[in-house]
Amino acid sequence: MSRPTVSPGSLAEQAQFAMLLEVTARGKPGNIDRCHDYEDTRLDHFLSSAVLAQPIFSAMEAGTLSFGDSMREAVARTNMHRGGNTHFGAFLLLLPLIAGKGIAGATELVKKTTVTDAVLFYEAFGLTQVRVRTEDPMDVNDPASIQRLKDEQITMYSVMEYSAPHDMVAREWTNGFALTRRAADLLFAQKGGVHAI
């Protein structure tokens, strides 16, 4: 008997599923997974974030939120638990992929981000506890940096270009999501392709 053809779901659902799969994977040295928690952040905080982010993912897929708005709202919604930063980096990767309807579209979309997107990104950083280099002239925790973004008309993409030499997620934005593409290619090469899971 053949298996019925099943839709892989909306992009928002796929992003949510990716977040759930990532955190429940086994054997992630140094990271939270189903067998390892930190004192102040646990698996259930990550699971909560994946659920709480869904409306933002759906709004991005529908095109009703800008990148900056979606980043700020995703962080605000997922701060409803006490576990601190759970998915900031995942949001930076997934939101453009959802809005761009895949890697090719995301690669073009990120280049069109605005100064307002950059300001909202900095505000999102302020809502979480992401560790950053404090000696950086564009320190996300320094209120003067937001004014600099406005004064110098620095877009979100420019922020990522600036950060790319020392930040893997920023590098994904500026190199066409190369690691994301490689991981996707590996998954599609598995028996079953999109239905491998």
Residue locations for each model-derived region?
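Long, hydrophobic/aromatic-enriched structural stretches that serve as scaffold segments
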Residues: 57-105
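Phosphate-rich cofactor/ligand-interacting catalytic cores and adjacent structured alpha/beta frameworks
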Residues: 1-65, 101-197
